[in-house]
A protein has these predicted regions:
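Acidic, metal-coordinating catalytic segment for phosphate/diphosphate chemistry
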Residues: 1-22
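A generic fold-level signal
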Residues: 16-18, 26, 83-84, 101
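Acidic/histidine-enriched, glycine/proline-rich intrinsically disordered or flexible terminal extensions
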Residues: 134-155
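A short coil-to-beta-strand element that immediately follows conserved catalytic motifs
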Residues: 69-79
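Active-site-adjacent beta-strand/loop module that shapes the phosphate/pyrophosphate-binding cleft
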Residues: 79-113, 121-136, 142
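Short histidine/acidic/glycine/proline-rich micro-motifs that form metal-
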Residues: 48-49, 113-115
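Conserved Nudix-box catalytic region and its N-terminal flanking loop in Nudix hydrolases
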Residues: 26-65
Length: 157
């Protein structure tokens, strides 16, 4: 699946905002979150380097943090905070996640209201994703179809 979002010109953002790519990776038992040593859990992803598309940054960061290889991604939405400008993607990944690089821990969560110590930004993104996933809009229906297909492919592999 090709990410069409990269065809759009970058929205003009204040210079002090960090351009981040954030992944929602649904595993069979929940959404993957990661944490560095002594830190809170966060959705995987990271900062885009100068001249790097956020979708490219996401592929690199996911590999560095979890060892997963992204097979495809679907742009979901932008999430702007006072410090970060996230592009949020649903990612279909291959492999078994393992903490790597700066990440020490991983967990799977089934609700944005999990009691896990989760960054506020990640919790807000997960709430928005849960709403989108439950919508009867074309995007919500497409999202559910993609997840169903990803689960089928995982069983076949």
């Amino acid at each position: 699946m090709r990410n069409l979002d990269d065809k759009k010109p970058e929205q003009r953002l204040p210079a002090d905002l960090t351009r981040r790519a954030t992944a929602i990776i649904e595993m069979p038992n929940g959404v993957l979150v990661t944490a560095p040593r002594g830190g809170r859990y966060n959705l995987p992803g990271g900062k885009a380097n100068r001249g790097e598309l956020r979708s490219q940054a996401l592929i690199r960061e996911i590999r560095e943090q979890t060892g997963l290889r992204i097979n495809s991604m679907l742009y979901l939405f932008d999430h702007i905070t006072p410090f970060n400008a996230h592009k949020v993607y649903l990612c279909i990944a291959q492999g078994q996640p393992r903490p790597q690089g700066e990440m020490e821990r991983m967990a799977l969560i089934t609700s944005p209201d999990s009691e896990l110590e989760l960054f506020v930004e990640s919790r807000a993104i997960l709430r928005r994703y849960a709403r989108l996933r439950g919508e009867e809009s074309a995007k919500g229906q497409a999202l559910r179809a993609i997840l169903k297909l990803a689960r089928y492919i995982a069983k076949v592999d």
